[in-house]
Curated annotation (Swiss-Prot):
Optimum temperature is 51 degrees Celsius. However, enzyme stability is dramatically reduced at this temperature, incubation for 30 minutes at 31 and 49 degrees Celsius results in 61% and 17% residual activity, respectively. Incubation at 60 degrees Celsius leads to total inactivation of the enzyme. This is Bifunctional cytochrome P450/NADPH--P450 reductase 1. It is an enzyme of class 1 (oxidoreductase). Residues 671-904 form the FAD-binding FR-type domain. It comes from Bacillus subtilis (strain 168). The gene is cypD. The lineage of its organism: Bacteria, Bacillati, Bacillota, Bacilli, Bacillales.
Length: 1061
């Protein structure tokens, strides 16, 4: 057990504890001083209780782990609850109204929502500009005062369509006076002794009066909106009054709406006004930074009032704001509590009764994170977001409890500071020295400057300028569209694929989309569709997988044709090949892609780029990305093309329109699937087993036939849990009907152009729990404006990190979206990035000789602790099928594998079957067929089944196998790997013990079948067979390998193992 250390504490003063060390008017400055003396962690005791203050970035990283810590509403925040109640800022995470309001209001603070607020923000900013422009020469500007007026009016107008008209008042609005006094009183209450508090009768009376003043204003805003009815407003108040929480279906009650409005009026203007004031101060004290800011503003803000797009282009202004928040975060601390007793820093014990305060100004000055110049004002440190120190920048709080209005504040502040610099020269006529003023937030105290107009002409900023500019921007964008590749001369690209499970097809369609969006004419098709029709104009790209060394079902005919044509027949064809494979099948890895690549060259085609390989058990996406880069570069060189840098490089976009009606998924058509029904669904494991294996009988449609050894493909349904998670994350309802439209081929799996419910769309069309790809993670990062969170996401796609943190833990894009709530990815883009829902293939475990109208499958239910360490992982198809009941519908199709996995035509041919666990499935069908043949009077060759399981509890089909053995249909050899009192035994061990028998059977022309795990079991079985061959025939290793390969090439050895591509 590790030794713990006491948390440092400054000197105490009797019953007052450390209270005398805290300046009641500027407590944050006192804590900063103590942190400089005590270090990155210390504790203070006051009559109000004990607080652990943390400021070192490594310790902050620990306490910001939301699995271990959550936001605490104590101290000053607890006092603020007197007038903000369970609003977003002052509610506990476990309170129902926090989650409800968070779900309802998140969309109104997204980056996209800022576009709707932009015009109103300009409206208020223009009032500030006009006020300053009308000042007399040398007349002082109260910077914090005017910024407070601006930010209050902005949140009032944008959030509630209420005008405080602060610039038309001689004195602040009564709400402001009451709010400032109430916040100040809340801060001081926590520093007073109970006896002091009781004696302050007048102060308490004023506190109640100020609260009632705020309540009266807010209640009147709500009442007026209700009286006027729905005027199609899209602001905060409209959502609070009209929108239901997608999770509970409930609306916010009027009391909570009151608390939310007060919360936003406080948080929405206090912090932003402080930010603008600090930024102004820093610019005046750093003329070189001010000069750069003026240069950017003059270059970008060319209209009277900035457009939304122009504000986004003010990158240096945003850096100034970020750096101002670093040095003086206007919300200087946030409080946390541990969910259970723990240790931080490897030695400091924290109990559930402790309260932790993250001291943000000191965190932002941590030299270990920010470097030796941490005290300096240097906006350039935010130029490259990937260099912002991890967990060392928290101006908006942490995680799901971070400030919901961050985007609102930053857009408003960027717009306002840009406009100020566009129109005014700032003058520090008083040579101001910074004096921090604190209520619950920080701002410069008594800060005055003077301004001079930078332009002699009168300032007439047009409030509508931003909107008027929009059509022009759109026109420019439309005119810019066109080919981004010069020299195509209408030459096409044909992308062909061979794919059984969808991976290769998905890659092919993505390649076609990419080319199409660069102005290239493209087509996609299965390889079998282009037999004898490879074009000699343009380029051909082939993406294909292998199945045990055999081509996919939609590529087999093409491979055969390619093999039969004469050399020289494909002269003039220009091609490139990318192969999908799995290195666990080393003997056949990339066999088909390699064969196609070599055959094309041999038959006269020209390879314009080297073949690429993607390993689905490795870094498939990284390998694909590298190949795509080189392939496109080679194509440009080979065909004499040039890149048009001025072309529109927009991605394929998916649009979504809400409608009413019904819809269906097109995936069933793409696999020629049919609707069937479940006839029986029963458990095969014993009652005391901790696993689940289902035997499922499926009543087939009239026109569907199968044979033993075939596969039954199932189009599964995503779990309701995961569908609900997505709907909740995006604030949508599953019952809503939408119509999708798309410009690219990669959306072909979606039900385009017809109504479909969001529930059905997410249930039947896309993979939602696959590990996130690097491309998906990069997209998530691009939609995340919170610098620390964006940096975290960007780091996840790095070499090594991606494999360890995403692939091995099977972290999905949905998991990441839930973790990073600041990610503002639109639902349409999320949907577009999800891969098509792939069919799951099961070996049929029955024989049509018993019942041709019914087929069974044997499904091992995948269910267990998630590799991510969070919750339970459930396989999509196996759990979907496990829950189906007799009579339920299932979408299915039959596929005959290319591996010749069928019974010998001559029933007297001896057979060896190896199938542990659910690998026994196809052999059950074989044995049923042999049973029928025997009853028909046919003579059977000997048959051996090597079955494996852990113990008697998961010995599936035991009764049937024992009956087949009793009836002389088969000899069963069972290996138990976890049976008490017996050594651990696998099927290959039993086969090694019976080497003479097995080799004798195979030498006499017997057939060998192996079904099940291809990564471990199948290679071990093959190794055992090769050793047996060596031992029996006295040969070497190479001869044994050649023998086994010959068996496979001649069809005497067939495998039904899964590569997952």
């Amino acid at each position: 057990m590790k030794e713990t250390s006491p948390i440092p504490q400054p000197k105490t003063f009797g019953p007052l504890g450390n209270l005398p060390l805290i300046d009641k008017d500027k407590p944050t400055l006192s804590l900063i001083k103590l942190a400089e003396e005590q270090g990155p962690i210390f504790q203070i005791h006051t009559p109000a209780g004990t607080t652990i203050v943390v400021s070192g970035h490594e310790l902050v990283k620990e306490v910001c782990d939301e699995e271990r810590f959550d936001k605490s509403i104590e101290g000053a925040l607890e006092k603020v609850r007197a007038f903000s109640g369970d609003g977003l800022f002052t509610s506990w995470t476990h309170e129902p109204n926090w989650r409800k309001a968070h779900n309802i209001l998140m969309p109104t603070f997204s980056q996209r929502a800022m576009k709707d607020y932009h015009e109103k923000m300009v409206d208020i900013a223009v009032q500030l500009i006009q006020k300053w422009a009308r000042l007399n020469p040398n007349e002082a500007v109260d910077v914090p005062g005017d910024m407070t007026r601006l930010t209050l009016d902005t949140i009032g107008l944008c959030g509630f369509n209420y005008r405080f008209n602060s610039y038309y008042r001689e004195t602040p609005h009564p709400f402001i006076n009451s709010m400032v006094r109430a916040l100040d009183e809340a801060m001081h209450q926590m520093q007073r002794l109970d006896v002091q508090d009781k004696l302050m009768v007048r102060t308490k009376r004023q506190f109640r009066y100020d609260i009632q003043t705020m309540f009266s204003l807010v209640d009147s805003i709500i009442a007026e909106r209700r009286a006027n009815g729905d005027q199609d407003e899209k602001d905060l108040l409209a959502r609070m009054l009209n929108v239901e929480d997608p999770e509970t279906g409930e609306k916010l009650d009027d009391e909570n709406i009151r608390f939310q409005i007060i919360t936003f009026l406080i948080a929405g203007h206090e912090t932003t006004s402080g930010l603008l004031s600090f930024a102004t101060y820093f610019l005046l004290k750093h003329p070189d930074k001010l000069k750069k800011a003026y240069e950017e503003v003059d270059r970008v803000l060319t209209d009277a009032a900035p457009t939304y797009k122009q504000v986004l282009e003010l990158t240096y202004i945003r850096m100034i704001l970020n750096e101002s928040l670093r040095l003086w975060p206007t919300a200087p601390a946030f409080s946390l509590y541990p969910k259970e007793d723990t240790v931080i820093g490897g030695k400091f014990p924290i109990t559930t009764n402790d309260r932790i305060s993250v001291l943000i100004p000191q965190l932002h000055r941590d030299r270990d994170a920010w470097g030796k110049d941490a005290e300096e004002f240097r906006p350039e440190r935010f130029e490259h977001q990937d260099q912002v120190p991890h967990h060392a920048y928290k101006p908006f709080g942490n995680g799901q409890r971070a400030c919901i209005g961050m985007q609102f504040a930053l857009h408003e502040a960027t717009l306002v500071l840009g406009m100020i610099l566009k129109y005014f020269t700032l003058i520090d006529h008083e040579n101001y020295e910074l004096d921090i003023k604190q209520t619950l937030t920080l701002k410069p105290g008594d800060f005055h400057i003077s301004v001079q107009s930078r332009h002699q002409e009168a300032i007439h900023a047009d409030v509508q300028a931003a909107e008027k500019a929009a059509p022009d921007e759109q026109k420019e964008k439309t005119e810019a569209k066109g080919a981004s590749v010069i020299g195509l001369n209408n030459r096409p690209l044909l992308v062909l694929y061979g794919s059984d499970t969808g991976t290769a097809e998905g890659v092919a369609r993505e390649l076609a989309d990419t080319a199409s969006l660069h102005g290239v004419r493209t087509k996609t098709a299965p390889l079998n569709d282009r037999i004898g029709k490879l074009p000699k104009e343009g380029a051909v790209v082939i993406v294909t997988s292998s199945y045990n060394g055999k081509p996919p079902s939609n590529a087999g005919q093409f491979v055969q044709w390619l093999q039969e044509i004469k050399p020289g027949e494909l002269e003039g064809v220009h091609y490139a090949v990318f192969g999908c494979g799995d290195h666990n099948w080393a003997s056949t890895y990339q066999y088909v892609p390699r064969f196609i690549d070599e055959q094309l060259a041999e038959k006269g085609a020209t390879r314009f780029s080297a073949r690429g390989e993607g390993d689905v058990s490795g870094d498939f996406e990284g390998q694909l990305d590298e190949w795509k880069k080189s392939m496109w570069a080679d194509a440009i060189k080979a065909f004499g093309l040039e890149l048009n840098e001025n072309a529109d490089k927009e991605r394929s976009t998916l649009s979504l329109q809400f409608v009413r009606g019904l819809g269906e998924s097109p995936l069933a058509r793409s696999y020629e699937a049919s609707h069937a029904s479940i006839a029986e669904n029963r458990e095969l494991q014993s009652a005391d087993s901790d696993r689940s294996t289902r035997h499922i009988e499926i009543a087939l449609p009239p026109d569907v036939e199968y044979q033993e050894g075939d596969h039954l493909g199932v189009l599964p349904k995503n779990s309701q849990t995961n569908v609900s998670r997505i709907l909740h994350r995006f604030g949508l309802k599953g019952t809503d009907q939408v119509t999708l439209s798309a410009s690219g081929r990669s959306a072909g799996h979606l039900p385009l152009g017809r109504p479909v419910s969001l529930h059905d769309l997410l249930s039947y069309s896309v993979e939602v729990q696959e590990a996130a790809t690097r491309a998906q993670i990069r997209e998530l990062a691009s939609f995340t404006v919170c610098p620390p969170h964006r940096r975290e996401l960007e780091e996840l796609s790095a070499e090594g990190v991606y494999q360890e943190q995403i692939l091995k833990k099977r972290i999905s894009m949905l998991d990441l979206l839930e973790k990073y709530e600041a990610c503002d990815m639109p639902f349409e883009r999320f949907l577009e990035l999800l891969r098509p829902l792939k069919p799951r293939y099961y070996s049929i475990s029955s024989s049509p000789r018993v019942n041709p109208r019914q087929a069974s499958i044997t499904v091992g239910v995948v269910r267990g602790p998630a590799w991510s360490g969070r919750g339970e992982y459930r396989g999509v198809a196996s759990n979907d099928l496990a829950e189906r009941q007799a009579g339920d519908d299932v979408v299915m199709f039959i596929r005959t594998p290319e591996s010749r996995f069928q019974l010998p035509k001559d029933p007297e041919t001896p057979i060896i079957m190896v199938g542990p666990g659910t690998g026994v499935a196809p052999f059950r069908g074989f044995l049923q067929a042999r049973d029928v043949l025997k009853r028909e009077g046919k003579t059977l060759g000997e048959a051996h089944l090597y079955f494996g399981c852990r113990n008697d509890r998961d010995f599936i089909y035991r009764d049937e196998l024992e009956r087949f053995e009793k009836d002389g249909i088969v000899t069963v050899h069972t290996a138990f790997s976890r049976k008490e009192g017996m050594p651990k035994t696998y099927v290959q061990h039993l086969m090694a013990d019976q080497a003479d028998t097995l080799i004798s059977i195979l030498d006499r022309g017997g057939r060998l079948y192996v079904c099940g795990d291809g990564s471990k079991m199948a290679p071990d079985v093959e190794a055992a067979l090769q050793k047996a061959y060596q031992a029996v025939h006295g040969t070497g290793e190479q001869e044994a390998q050649n023998w086994l390969r010959h068996l496979q090439d001649t069809g005497m050895y067939a495998k039904d193992v899964w590569a997952g591509i």
